[in-house]
């Protein structure tokens, strides 16, 4: 159940005890005193919200707040900050690295899925989208309310916040750009619990940083998108697959996997040969469910590349190809050690002879095995230094921290 009851005041001594149990009591008491709904440990709602998408890395939050308003988010951020607990928003919860849980144990998780309103202003074409909305809901509401759309990814259950704040690649991206390219503003709760609007005209540095590295900087509670006319024609098709019903349902909830990603320019003949040889060698020898997805990301006719590289923190507009590497096993299985080296080998063989500056990685297809320094460089490239300065300005004590987040220019020790 979601609880709002006021707990008894804790003693000053209990506030400094570092055990997870006492931390939870402190945080829950703070949330309750501020009238912020939260999940009771052991309740069905805790089990639902606290179940990770990637069961290989099952991180456990110290507490789960369930905000319904921006004011709830403000109060929850204050509870975490004042009690030394990192704060992490979770929208759809589909981060491959479980970053919505914090990417590690012990965070105050903000479950945003009760904040899902979508409103279209037909006079301006501007859509207001709450951060807990899923992509399918956003798409259907924009079309229903005015025949409008934004560019976004293909999975309807993915949360809009994490998707938009780090890129938002999908089938429409080649002609319409990334989801973040349609963002014109956002309402953001900062580490000091203040609420600001970020746009080109207001808090422009923060707005630039949100578009590519948003989860490192604050909690966006509301987005403002320009929209375009949805296509008037669509192709209908029917595919009948021989699926096991229960396994199909389970597959939408959780998976057990390791993933990685890559951006590159056009591959040389030697690199193509190396990629294909690895596929037919190591790949064919691995008798389980793995796949590689290669998307035409950039190029001279791409709407992604047409937008200036300095328009946002998204760092890899110039890259032609975007790859996703994915290896999974049954939910109940122990993920095998050879899976890590297998996917890393795929990346290494694809980038044979390639300079570090000629490649990158996509935060929305994260590789959780990367160290923080390497991850920052691979995700944000030449934009990292500016991002670190902005991080230092808005969150110097890293209230919003996870193992691959942007660090401030002068980071503190954890």
Range-by-range predicted roles:
Residues 2-10, 14-414:
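Soluble FAD-dependent oxygen oxidases
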């Amino acid at each position: 159940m979601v609880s709002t009851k006021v707990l008894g005041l804790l003693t000053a001594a209990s506030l400094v005890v570092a055990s997870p149990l006492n931390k939870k009591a402190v945080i829950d008491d703070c949330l309750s005193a501020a009238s912020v709904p939260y999940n009771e440990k052991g309740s069905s709602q805790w089990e639902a919200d606290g179940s990770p998408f990637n069961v290989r890395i099952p991180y456990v939050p110290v507490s789960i707040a369930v905000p319904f308003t921006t004011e709830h988010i403000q109060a929850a951020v204050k509870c975490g900050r004042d009690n030394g607990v990192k704060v992490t928003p979770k929208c759809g919860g589909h981060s491959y690295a479980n970053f919505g849980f914090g990417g590690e144990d012990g965070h105050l998780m903000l479950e945003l899925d009760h904040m899902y309103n979508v409103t279209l202003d037909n006079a301006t074409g501007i859509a207001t989208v709450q951060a807990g909305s899923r992509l399918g809901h956003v798409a259907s509401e924009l079309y229903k309310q005015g025949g409008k759309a934004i560019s976004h990814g293909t999975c309807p259950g993915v949360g809009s916040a994490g998707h938009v704040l780090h890129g938002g690649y999908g089938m429409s991206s080649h002609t319409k750009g990334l989801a973040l390219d349609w963002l014109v503003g956002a309402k953001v709760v900062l580490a000091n619990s203040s609420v600001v609007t970020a746009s080109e005209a207001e808090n422009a540095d923060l707005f630039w940083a949100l578009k590519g590295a948003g989860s490192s900087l604050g909690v966006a509670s509301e987005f403002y998108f320009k929209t375009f006319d949805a296509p008037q024609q669509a192709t209908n098709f029917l595919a009948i697959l021989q699926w096991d019903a229960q396994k199909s349902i389970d597959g939408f909830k959780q998976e057990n996997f390791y993933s990685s990603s890559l951006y590159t320019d056009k591959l040389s003949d030697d690199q193509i040969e190396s990629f294909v040889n690895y596929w037919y060698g190591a790949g064919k020898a691995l008798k389980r469910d793995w796949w590689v997805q290669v998307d035409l990301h950039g190029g001279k006719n791409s709407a992604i590349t047409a937008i200036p590289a300095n328009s946002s923190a998204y760092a890899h507009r110039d890259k032609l190809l975007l790859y996703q590497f994915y290896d999974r096993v049954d939910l109940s299985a122990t993920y095998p050690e050879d899976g890590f080296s297998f996917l890393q080998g795929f990346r290494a063989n694809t980038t044979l002879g390639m300079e570090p500056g000629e490649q990158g990685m996509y935060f929305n297809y994260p590789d959780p095995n990367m160290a923080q320094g390497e991850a920052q460089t691979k995700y944000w490239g030449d934009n990292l230094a500016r991002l670190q300065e902005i991080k230092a300005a808005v969150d110097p004590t890293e209230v919003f921290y996870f193992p691959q987040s942007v660090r401030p220019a002068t980071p503190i020790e954890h």
